[in-house]
């Protein structure tokens, strides 16, 4: 008979194109692919490219109505993973036309929306994305960025200090405000709502906002420094989230906060636009990230979530601590910390950076080191992160035997000592403990 036979077809015939020269408008992706036994690498790589772009499992007559060559994703390179016999990195190029402008949501729906459940693969992990400059320019990015934030806060030449208020659930609004005041008065720049503090029966959001604003103004008056508290605006609906941000703006506080993964990219981008229009800084917490990024061979690496956040918008984002972890992890973490802060980042596989990324002057995001850190980590943190970071000590402040304010003083004294030692040319990695011991004399 005339015509074609429909049937399950080999993807590699159409979607594996090793001779393809990538365009600088393409979105490039590096996938770590673990195929099912018996599935050749080229077929698995091509399947990923097809399923995340134009492909379907058979030939359909409407294929004739469009130009596949213009719209298809292409697997253009495959390389083995050293030390893993059943894994390889598949590089896929997507034409820019496949994506809606200014929508991180659509970018992820396209690239990772469907393909992760694909039968021919045992596991799939998105390791990195190269976002072309043409696509970046369709995003507003962070509401303000590192430089504007320093100008707003009038704080230069050192990392900023924060503290998450604990116990995170159960305090009344008034007592919560007291804890905020003590920390800010003692010398911290910021205090923080915990990521799961939204608006619960024991403390409704509006009461918390009011008492925290009072604490901020009182601490500012006493210290002569600009203070902030990350008021968590995360809510069940976008409307409610914006309502909370509006109230924060009416109180005149400098910064609000959002959980960008649980809240979702659409909500996050909405809030980021509101924050830029209204002069609010935006602190981003990455609650739920480990669900996506913890498995080594499946999911998405955090550097992809970090890039997505810079596009969607946020002025701070939690990025791990590095201290006390393995050396290799330090390089990888510093890799995505630079992806958040710098304007141009060279490809560097030793730091997990698969592609050179140019952010074309999109504002940078301050990485936040938080979780299990305390005063003795200060030299290492100052050494590793440099000035452009927020160091957050929760228990490391509130756990001080004399209380919150002395705990805050201790952190500030330690930080100032480390910055001064570094500026005087001392080696913090080697002499850190000594620097802290000297500083102890001036600290509660």
From Swiss-Prot:
One of its GO terms (cellular component) is chloroplast. Mg(2+) binds at residues 192, 194-195. The record marks 325 as: Transition state stabilizer. Its cofactor is Mg(2+). The modification N6-carboxylysine is found at residue 192. The keyword Metal-binding applies. The keyword Repressor does not apply. SUPFAM superfamilies: RuBisCo, C-terminal domain, RuBisCO, large subunit, small (N-terminal) domain. It is found in: Plastid, Chloroplast. It is an enzyme of class 4 (lyase). Binds 1 Mg(2+) ion per subunit. It catalyses: 2 (2R)-3-phosphoglycerate + 2 H(+) = D-ribulose 1,5-bisphosphate + CO2 + H2O; D-ribulose 1,5-bisphosphate + O2 = 2-phosphoglycolate + (2R)-3-phosphoglycerate + 2 H(+). Heterohexadecamer of 8 large chains and 8 small chains; disulfide-linked. The disulfide link is formed within the large subunit homodimers. RuBisCO catalyzes two reactions: the carboxylation of D-ribulose 1,5-bisphosphate, the primary event in carbon dioxide fixation, as well as the oxidative fragmentation of the pentose substrate in the photorespiration process. Both reactions occur simultaneously and in competition at the same active site. This is Ribulose bisphosphate carboxylase large chain. It comes from Ephedra sinica. The gene is rbcL.
